[in-house]
Amino acid sequence: MMGNVVNLSEARHKTEVKAADLMDLAEYGKVRKQKRAELVPLKKARRVPIGPHATFYFESYETMWLQIHEMLFIEKGGPDQIPDELAAYNPLIPKGRDLSATLMFEIDDEKLRKSVLGRLGGVEETIFLKFGDHEIQARAETDVDRTTADGKASSVQFIHFDFTDDQAAAFKDFDGDVMLGIRHENYPHMTLLSADTKATLGADLV
């Protein structure tokens, strides 16, 4: 791993974290607080709550760069851990024609969490993004089944919204309401993206 301090603002449109992009962990430890603080405004614009329990966290090169470093720093698996972390998190970086998000159902009460998730099987297939005449159905990551055989949803879902060239151009130019929604019969909720969030996500479509 490299020992240089990385300027994340210069990495805005990178689509993959490479081993050469990683800091020496001793050096990362020195700037860890600074790097986490740098991403607070970015993460705020990428956080979209929907309904009482769900939150979308739209990912980017910067958020995944930080997440990979955090995993390496906390777990201390050494060089052998690096390929696994890159393989796990690189698919969540938008590639220029998609928006990528981690959807989390955040419920502290264990009994309530089990009850809610037990009724949300297949929720990953009911997510959409709508703007103007365009509606984009979310595509779930297929690394593992996010719904169990007995119909229980995972509390963490990884999803993508895939855009055509025309849809990407339309989204970047669109100045009306952008709706993010879930159509699951047991969690029918929708929300409008803030102007800040819409602009941030539009910049992901290059």
Question: Can you say where each PLM-predicted feature lies in the sequence?
Answer:
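Long, contiguous binding/interaction regions
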Residues: 3-98, 106-206
